[in-house]
Amino acid sequence: MANILDRYGIKEVADVTFYDVNDDGSRGAPVLYLDTLKVSTIEQTAEEAEARGGKGNPPLIIWDYGKEITVTLEDALFSVKSMAIMFGDGTADDLTTITKTQTFKGTTAPTQYTILGGKTVSITSSTIYDVTGSVVTSDSLQADTTYFQTFDLTVTGSSIEISAQTFPGTYYVTGDTYARSETTGKDEFFQFIIPKAKVQSENTITLEAEGDPSVFNMNLRVMRPADGVMMKLVKYDLGE
Protein backbone atom coordinates (compact mmCIF):
# COMPACT_ATOMS: atom_id res chain seq x y z
CA MET A 1 0.00 0.00 0.00
CA ALA A 2 1.39 3.39 -1.00
CA ASN A 3 2.03 5.92 1.74
CA ILE A 4 0.04 9.08 0.97
CA LEU A 5 2.82 11.17 2.53
CA ASP A 6 5.59 9.79 0.29
CA ARG A 7 6.61 12.33 -2.34
CA TYR A 8 9.06 12.07 -5.20
CA GLY A 9 10.70 14.17 -7.86
CA ILE A 10 11.69 13.19 -11.40
CA LYS A 11 14.58 14.81 -13.22
CA GLU A 12 15.95 12.21 -15.57
CA VAL A 13 15.14 11.05 -19.07
CA ALA A 14 13.88 7.51 -19.59
CA ASP A 15 15.52 4.62 -21.40
CA VAL A 16 12.82 3.33 -23.74
CA THR A 17 12.38 -0.14 -25.23
CA PHE A 18 10.07 -1.05 -28.11
CA TYR A 19 8.70 -4.60 -28.42
CA ASP A 20 6.68 -6.36 -31.08
CA VAL A 21 3.05 -6.99 -30.17
CA ASN A 22 2.07 -10.67 -30.38
CA ASP A 23 -1.16 -11.83 -31.99
CA ASP A 24 -2.78 -12.13 -28.55
CA GLY A 25 -1.73 -8.57 -27.59
CA SER A 26 1.08 -9.64 -25.28
CA ARG A 27 4.64 -8.33 -25.34
CA GLY A 28 6.87 -9.91 -27.98
CA ALA A 29 10.57 -9.63 -28.80
CA PRO A 30 12.43 -6.32 -28.32
CA VAL A 31 12.99 -4.45 -31.59
CA LEU A 32 14.48 -1.11 -30.47
CA TYR A 33 16.33 0.21 -27.41
CA LEU A 34 16.79 3.96 -26.89
CA ASP A 35 19.27 5.04 -24.20
CA THR A 36 20.39 8.36 -25.73
CA LEU A 37 17.13 10.29 -25.37
CA LYS A 38 17.23 14.00 -24.54
CA VAL A 39 13.54 14.30 -23.68
CA SER A 40 10.78 11.78 -23.00
CA THR A 41 7.39 13.38 -22.39
CA ILE A 42 4.01 11.82 -21.52
CA GLU A 43 0.92 13.98 -21.99
CA GLN A 44 -2.71 13.13 -21.22
CA THR A 45 -5.64 15.16 -22.52
CA ALA A 46 -9.42 14.72 -22.62
CA GLU A 47 -12.52 16.56 -23.70
CA GLU A 48 -15.34 17.71 -21.45
CA ALA A 49 -19.09 18.07 -21.65
CA GLU A 50 -20.95 19.86 -18.88
CA ALA A 51 -24.41 20.66 -17.62
CA ARG A 52 -24.91 24.28 -16.57
CA GLY A 53 -27.83 26.00 -14.94
CA GLY A 54 -29.10 28.22 -12.14
CA LYS A 55 -28.13 31.79 -11.35
CA GLY A 56 -24.86 32.68 -13.03
CA ASN A 57 -25.10 29.51 -15.15
CA PRO A 58 -22.30 27.64 -13.30
CA PRO A 59 -21.23 24.10 -14.23
CA LEU A 60 -23.30 21.51 -12.32
CA ILE A 61 -22.04 18.22 -13.72
CA ILE A 62 -18.95 17.57 -15.84
CA TRP A 63 -18.40 14.52 -18.02
CA ASP A 64 -14.93 13.62 -19.30
CA TYR A 65 -14.51 11.73 -22.56
CA GLY A 66 -12.17 11.33 -25.51
CA LYS A 67 -9.04 10.55 -23.49
CA GLU A 68 -5.78 10.92 -25.43
CA ILE A 69 -2.31 9.92 -24.20
CA THR A 70 0.69 10.88 -26.30
CA VAL A 71 4.40 10.23 -25.80
CA THR A 72 7.15 12.35 -27.34
CA LEU A 73 10.68 10.99 -27.57
CA GLU A 74 13.58 13.22 -28.63
CA ASP A 75 16.76 11.29 -29.37
CA ALA A 76 20.24 12.76 -29.67
CA LEU A 77 21.30 9.89 -31.96
CA PHE A 78 19.69 7.62 -34.50
CA SER A 79 20.21 4.04 -35.60
CA VAL A 80 19.16 2.30 -38.79
CA LYS A 81 16.44 0.53 -36.81
CA SER A 82 15.07 3.69 -35.17
CA MET A 83 14.97 5.44 -38.55
CA ALA A 84 13.19 2.46 -40.09
CA ILE A 85 10.56 2.53 -37.33
CA MET A 86 10.11 6.31 -37.63
CA PHE A 87 9.71 6.47 -41.41
CA GLY A 88 8.69 3.01 -42.59
CA ASP A 89 7.55 -0.39 -41.49
CA GLY A 90 10.55 -1.03 -39.25
CA THR A 91 12.62 -2.95 -41.79
CA ALA A 92 15.92 -2.08 -43.46
CA ASP A 93 17.54 -3.82 -46.42
CA ASP A 94 21.20 -4.27 -47.28
CA LEU A 95 22.51 -1.72 -49.77
CA THR A 96 25.14 -2.53 -52.42
CA THR A 97 25.25 0.49 -54.77
CA ILE A 98 24.61 4.23 -54.58
CA THR A 99 24.59 6.99 -57.20
CA LYS A 100 26.86 10.02 -56.78
CA THR A 101 27.38 13.24 -58.75
CA GLN A 102 30.38 15.56 -58.70
CA THR A 103 31.42 18.59 -60.73
CA PHE A 104 34.68 19.11 -62.57
CA LYS A 105 36.30 21.44 -65.07
CA GLY A 106 38.54 20.58 -67.98
CA THR A 107 38.98 18.16 -70.81
CA THR A 108 39.44 15.03 -68.68
CA ALA A 109 36.76 13.45 -66.49
CA PRO A 110 37.91 12.27 -63.02
CA THR A 111 38.56 8.56 -62.62
CA GLN A 112 38.42 8.64 -58.81
CA TYR A 113 36.01 9.96 -56.17
CA THR A 114 37.30 11.37 -52.88
CA ILE A 115 35.52 10.23 -49.72
CA LEU A 116 35.88 11.08 -46.02
CA GLY A 117 39.44 11.12 -44.74
CA GLY A 118 40.90 11.90 -48.15
CA LYS A 119 40.55 8.33 -49.39
CA THR A 120 39.61 7.71 -53.00
CA VAL A 121 37.56 5.07 -54.81
CA SER A 122 37.73 4.27 -58.50
CA ILE A 123 35.04 5.37 -60.94
CA THR A 124 34.62 2.54 -63.44
CA SER A 125 31.80 4.03 -65.50
CA SER A 126 30.11 7.43 -65.56
CA THR A 127 27.83 9.74 -67.52
CA ILE A 128 28.83 13.35 -68.12
CA TYR A 129 26.37 16.24 -68.46
CA ASP A 130 26.84 19.89 -69.34
CA VAL A 131 25.11 22.75 -67.50
CA THR A 132 22.04 22.39 -69.73
CA GLY A 133 21.57 18.75 -68.73
CA SER A 134 22.67 17.33 -72.06
CA VAL A 135 24.89 14.25 -72.18
CA VAL A 136 28.36 14.94 -73.56
CA THR A 137 31.14 12.59 -74.60
CA SER A 138 34.61 12.62 -73.10
CA ASP A 139 36.20 13.68 -76.39
CA SER A 140 34.03 16.84 -76.55
CA LEU A 141 35.04 18.25 -73.16
CA GLN A 142 36.36 21.80 -73.21
CA ALA A 143 38.81 23.57 -70.94
CA ASP A 144 37.43 25.96 -68.26
CA THR A 145 33.93 24.51 -68.67
CA THR A 146 31.99 23.01 -65.76
CA TYR A 147 30.51 19.53 -66.15
CA PHE A 148 28.53 17.13 -63.96
CA GLN A 149 29.70 13.54 -63.64
CA THR A 150 27.20 10.91 -62.42
CA PHE A 151 28.31 7.40 -61.49
CA ASP A 152 27.52 4.37 -59.30
CA LEU A 153 29.69 3.17 -56.42
CA THR A 154 29.76 -0.22 -54.73
CA VAL A 155 29.07 0.23 -51.00
CA THR A 156 28.11 -1.64 -47.84
CA GLY A 157 25.19 -0.13 -45.96
CA SER A 158 21.46 -0.22 -45.27
CA SER A 159 18.48 1.16 -47.16
CA ILE A 160 15.10 2.17 -45.71
CA GLU A 161 12.36 2.32 -48.33
CA ILE A 162 9.49 4.75 -47.71
CA SER A 163 6.56 4.00 -49.98
CA ALA A 164 3.06 5.41 -50.22
CA GLN A 165 1.66 2.26 -48.60
CA THR A 166 4.22 2.01 -45.78
CA PHE A 167 3.55 3.57 -42.37
CA PRO A 168 5.05 3.17 -38.87
CA GLY A 169 3.68 0.33 -36.79
CA THR A 170 2.26 -0.38 -33.34
CA TYR A 171 4.48 -1.51 -30.46
CA TYR A 172 4.53 -2.47 -26.78
CA VAL A 173 6.66 0.24 -25.12
CA THR A 174 8.36 0.53 -21.74
CA GLY A 175 10.38 3.40 -20.29
CA ASP A 176 12.72 3.18 -17.30
CA THR A 177 13.96 6.10 -15.21
CA TYR A 178 14.35 7.16 -11.57
CA ALA A 179 12.20 8.97 -9.01
CA ARG A 180 14.02 10.62 -6.08
CA SER A 181 12.49 10.37 -2.62
CA GLU A 182 11.90 13.66 -0.81
CA THR A 183 12.48 11.92 2.53
CA THR A 184 15.69 9.98 1.85
CA GLY A 185 17.10 11.83 -1.16
CA LYS A 186 17.69 8.45 -2.80
CA ASP A 187 16.69 7.43 -6.30
CA GLU A 188 14.11 4.68 -6.73
CA PHE A 189 13.05 2.89 -9.89
CA PHE A 190 10.19 4.26 -11.98
CA GLN A 191 8.76 2.70 -15.13
CA PHE A 192 5.96 3.44 -17.56
CA ILE A 193 4.37 0.61 -19.53
CA ILE A 194 2.33 1.13 -22.69
CA PRO A 195 0.86 -2.12 -24.07
CA LYS A 196 -0.19 -0.59 -27.40
CA ALA A 197 1.45 2.52 -28.87
CA LYS A 198 1.16 3.66 -32.49
CA VAL A 199 4.20 5.47 -33.90
CA GLN A 200 2.97 8.62 -35.64
CA SER A 201 3.89 9.30 -39.27
CA GLU A 202 4.88 12.97 -38.89
CA ASN A 203 8.67 13.22 -38.72
CA THR A 204 11.31 15.79 -39.61
CA ILE A 205 15.05 15.51 -40.22
CA THR A 206 16.88 18.84 -40.08
CA LEU A 207 20.16 19.17 -41.99
CA GLU A 208 21.96 22.46 -41.38
CA ALA A 209 25.52 23.73 -41.32
CA GLU A 210 25.20 25.85 -38.17
CA GLY A 211 23.60 25.53 -34.76
CA ASP A 212 23.07 22.49 -32.58
CA PRO A 213 23.20 18.93 -33.92
CA SER A 214 19.99 17.50 -35.31
CA VAL A 215 17.69 15.62 -32.96
CA PHE A 216 15.34 12.83 -33.95
CA ASN A 217 11.76 12.99 -32.71
CA MET A 218 9.43 10.03 -32.40
CA ASN A 219 5.81 10.68 -31.46
CA LEU A 220 3.61 7.92 -30.07
CA ARG A 221 -0.16 7.79 -29.68
CA VAL A 222 -1.37 5.44 -26.97
CA MET A 223 -4.18 3.09 -27.98
CA ARG A 224 -6.63 1.09 -25.88
CA PRO A 225 -5.71 -2.61 -25.57
CA ALA A 226 -8.22 -5.40 -24.97
CA ASP A 227 -8.18 -5.03 -21.16
CA GLY A 228 -8.71 -1.25 -21.35
CA VAL A 229 -5.49 -0.34 -19.49
CA MET A 230 -3.77 2.19 -21.74
CA MET A 231 -0.73 2.83 -19.55
CA LYS A 232 0.79 1.83 -16.23
CA LEU A 233 3.07 3.97 -14.07
CA VAL A 234 5.14 1.81 -11.72
CA LYS A 235 7.41 2.89 -8.86
CA TYR A 236 9.27 -0.06 -7.45
CA ASP A 237 12.23 -1.20 -5.37
CA LEU A 238 14.38 -4.24 -6.09
CA GLY A 239 15.23 -4.55 -2.40
CA GLU A 240 18.57 -4.98 -0.69
Question: What does each model-identified segment do?
Answer:
Residues 126-143, 189-240:
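Mixed-charge, glycine-accented linear interaction segment located at domain edges/termini
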Residues 80-142, 152-186:
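Extended beta-strand solenoid/passenger and fiber regions
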Residues 2, 149-154:
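Hydrophobic membrane-targeting and insertion signals
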Residues 20, 75-79, 153, 175-181, ...:
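Beta-strand elements of well-folded, non-transmembrane domains
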Residues 2-85, 196-217:
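Solvent-exposed edge beta-strands and adjacent loop segments
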Residues 66-70, 140-148:
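Extracellular interaction modules
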Residues 24-27, 183-187:
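Short, solvent-exposed loop/turn segments that connect beta-strands within catalytic domains
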